[in-house]
A protein has these predicted regions:
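Acidic low-complexity intrinsically disordered segments
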Residues: 1-150
Length: 150
């Protein structure tokens, strides 16, 4: 594409997700992917792994290398939290709704909701992985300058 066609879009520089148990193995599940435009908001459903599960551990990670990897050890845990003291009576496979969002400020917000709770677990972390408004404006100015000089 020529410079005339270029646009500056703020994107996520690394992927983010949660560690989930898949086929009895901890797996890094990406919800936000590298180069997704910001703001971004993604919702995915996960499920409890046992009847009467009383705790849900939420581990949020950042992509550790150039490529997405499902191996937890290839990624960097940013923040952890738990939904605790869940009452008995919920079967294996009870839905947990996970929402992950990031604005142009690079702040990642993750909520995890189990039906037994009125309020979701909320985790917030400053990632530094998005350009701020001043950086986006500077990039736009640079592209506009190139366009004018063609």
């Amino acid at each position: 594409r020529s410079v005339v066609d270029k646009q500056v879009v703020n994107v996520v520089s690394r992927g983010f997700g949660v560690i989930a148990l898949r086929d009895e193995v901890d797996t890094a599940v990406f919800l936000v992917h590298q180069n997704d435009p910001v703001p971004v908001s993604v919702e995915e459903r996960f499920y409890t792994v046992a009847d009467d599960q009383d705790t849900i551990k939420v581990r949020v990670f950042e992509q550790g290398g150039a490529e997405e990897s499902p191996r937890p050890e290839d990624n960097t845990i940013l923040v952890e939290g738990e939904i605790t003291d869940l009452p008995p009576g919920y079967p294996r496979g009870t839905e947990i709704t996970m929402r992950m969002s990031m604005g142009g400020d690079g702040i990642l917000t993750v909520t995890a909701h189990h039906v037994a709770r009125l309020e979701p677990l909320k985790l917030v972390v400053e990632t530094g992985q998005a350009m701020n408004a001043a950086e986006v404006a500077a990039e736009r100015d640079a592209v506009n300058l190139l366009k004018r000089n063609l």
